A protein has these predicted regions:
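Short glycine-rich phosphate-binding loop at a beta-alpha junction
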Residues: 71-79, 154, 207, 391-403
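A conserved helix-loop-beta module that forms one wall/lid of the active-site cleft
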Residues: 192, 198-211, 436
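N-terminal glycine/serine-rich phosphate-binding loop of ATP-dependent small-molecule kinases
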Residues: 1-95, 123, 151, 223-232, ...
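Small/polar loops that bind or transfer phosphate-bearing groups
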Residues: 10, 97, 133, 154, ...
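Active-site core segments that coordinate phosphate-bearing ligands/cofactors
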Residues: 2, 7-8, 20, 113-126, ...
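Short beta-strand-loop/turn "lid" adjacent to the catalytic site in phosphate-handling enzymes
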Residues: 43, 63, 67-100, 125-132, ...
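Short alpha-helix plus adjacent loop in nuclease-associated cores
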Residues: 98, 102-115
Length: 469
């Protein structure tokens, strides 16, 4: 059998990239083929994604594969969750692809809770309340632009929309469907009774398919543009679900942090925990690969340090900022999950203000600011570990950190110190790796998720950080 290449298109809020992979001597070999910028743009008074430009970038990266003579056997696209497009009867897009950080959802939680209480909604879906969830975004469309919903014949989440543009076929991938807060964790299908109650048109919701499902080949038009045909296979299209699929552990009960702009900290469950205590701890039950549940908590993550770097130290690398922070003696803490840090005018000033208001030492230098943020994050991780252990009744021996934050050495050291658990960091490219692993399982190159995780552990460098306890 010749060498099979697999293509993951992994698009995040600030950039996207095409990662090719093949198997060599039982290991996954990764190669970045193309990288492109992304970001929200202001249009018609809203923050939106330029999905037309993004699709052109997807095609550009595919052409690069052809130029390199590395034609993928299959490809799959993952992006952030919750955002969607509406299509009319001719499959034309209605309006813009509005972004989750847009303010149109303000007050929409109250509209939803007028129809179903917050507690009942959690019992039905098991999904943590985030004001940007699709359920609130659709309520914003219904309230503010009802004509769009009346005109709509299909709703596609962003990665499903790109898969549709490639193949002409509409499907809804499971992991991303769960983030809408409109899916039933027991049936693994849309909660049509909830959808009817909310007054959303039932016919716009596509059939839900598992990761690994083959959507189809490229349409004739796309084949002409890129110069080849290949299968389009559903990865876990929610980027965090792909990252968690790449957690390199064989433990049945493992604790992970998918560490990037957000830190998603949790474990995998076979069944969702939609209990009231889970709701009160703001835990979520998002869908994972093979119908596992990602029982996790959203934590602010590296967004704060990214913002401070941009404002106060654009010329320093994150490694240098880590090194500066490790030399500081400042002991001030902030609540990293405070809404004030979501999108402040100036993160540097906001952190200083929070320290001043709580009567603590005010950080002055970049090193001090970074130290406050890293210590505060590690302390938050420690509290979250305690919550998860109390809710699941399981004591976890170590923490697996995957994603870009696996490179934040000082933060990893602090995480081990504050949690009292050993930390295993890597792979940093977890999202692309999980996307690729799902394709390789579908192709029969890897037996199942357990085999894929064993292969990932062999293929990529991991760093261990020992706790003192």
């Amino acid at each position: 059998m010749g060498k099979n290449y697999y293509l993951a298109v992994d698009i995040g809020a600030s950039s996207g990239r095409h990662m090719l992979s093949h198997m060599e001597n039982g290991k996954m070999i990764l190669e970045e083929i193309y990288r492109f910028p992304n970001g929200m743009v202001e249009k018609n008074g809203h923050k939106v994604w330029d999905v037309d430009k993004l699709f052109e970038e997807i095609l550009t990266g595919m052409k690069k594969c052809a130029l390199a003579g590395k034609i993928p056997y299959s490809m799959g696209i993952d992006t952030w969750a919750v955002d969607f497009v509406l299509l009319d009867e001719n499959d034309r897009r209605i309006g813009d692809a509005v972004a989750y950080r847009d303010r149109r959802t303000e007050g929409m939680d109250r509209r939803v809770y007028g129809i179903i209480s917050e507690e009942d909604l959690y019992l039905r879906t098991g999904i943590q309340k985030q004001i940007f969830n699709t359920i609130y975004q659709l309520m914003a469309v219904k309230e503010q632009q009802p004509g769009q919903l009346e005109q709509a014949k299909s709703m596609l989440m962003i990665p499903d929309y790109f898969h549709f543009l490639l193949t002409g076929k509409k499907v809804q991938e499971y992991t991303n469907a769960t983030t809408t807060q409109l899916a039933d964790p027991v049936t693994k299908d849309w909660d049509m009774e909830l959808i009817r109650k909310l007054g959303y048109p039932k016919e716009i919701f596509q059939k839900i398919k598992k990761s690994g499902f083959e959507v189809g080949g490229l349409s004739g038009e796309i084949q002409k543009k890129v110069g080849f045909d290949c299968k389009v296979v559903l990865p876990p299209t929610h980027d965090t679900a792909s990252a968690v699929a790449a957690v390199p552990t064989q433990d049945e009960h493992a604790l992970y942090i998918s560490s990037g702009t957000w830190s998603l900290m949790g474990t995998e469950l076979k069944e969702a925990d939609c209990s009231k205590s889970s709701m009160l701890h703001n835990m979520t039950n998002e869908g994972g690969y093979d119908y596992r549940f990602r029982y996790l908590k959203n934590i602010m993550g590296l967004w704060m340090i990214q913002s401070v770097k941009k404002e106060s130290a654009p010329d320093l690398g994150f490694g240098e900022i880590c090194a500066l922070a490790s030399k500081e003696a400042i002991t001030s803490f902030v609540d990293v999950n405070d809404a004030r840090f979501l999108a402040p005018q100036n993160m540097t000033e906001e952190v200083k203000k929070a320290c001043e208001e709580s009567g603590q030492q005010i950080p002055q230098t970049v090193g001090e600011l970074a130290a406050v943020i890293y210590h505060s994050l590690a302390e938050c991780y420690a509290k979250t570990v305690e919550e998860i252990e109390a809710l699941t009744g399981i004591t976890y021996p170590k923490i697996q950190i995957v994603g870009g934050g696996a490179n934040a050495q000082y933060l990893n050291e602090l995480t081990a110190k504050y949690t009292g658990k050993d930390v295993c960091a890597g792979p940093t490219e977890a999202t692309a790796v999980g996307n690729l692993a799902a394709q390789m399982i579908a192709a029969g190159e890897l037996r199942d998720l357990k085999a894929a995780r064993a292969c990932i552990a062999e293929s990529f460098e991991m760093n261990m950080f020992r706790s003192d306890k």
